């Protein structure tokens, strides 16, 4: 039986994404359209710390110029 692994707390990264988006004056709808995700998915990433797929994380940090090195 496998042990349940501790999951990374993604809330700090989500907050950094939200701050970068707002700094650039972009709405969730605009970002969602740009990277082809539902704005509700972005809301969950930003506010609830939902873990995005690797591709979505890459798209967000590339678009918004967020460095994830500090996390």
Predicted regions and their residues:
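Short C-terminal boundary/hinge segments that cap the last helix of small helical domains
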Residues: 54, 64-71
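Short basic helix-loop element that most often maps to the first helix and adjoining turn
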Residues: 15-34, 59
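Recognition helix of helix-turn-helix/homeodomain-like DNA-binding domains
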Residues: 36-51
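Key DNA-contact positions within bacterial/archaeal DNA-binding proteins
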Residues: 29, 40, 69
């Amino acid at each position: 039986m496998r042990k349940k692994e501790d999951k990374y707390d993604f809330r700090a990264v989500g907050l950094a994404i939200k701050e970068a988006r707002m700094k650039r004056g972009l709405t969730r709808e605009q970002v969602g359209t740009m990277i082809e995700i539902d704005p509700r998915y972005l809301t969950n990433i930003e506010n609830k710390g939902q873990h995005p797929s690797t591709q979505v994380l890459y798209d967000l940090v590339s678009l918004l110029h967020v460095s994830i090195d500090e996390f």
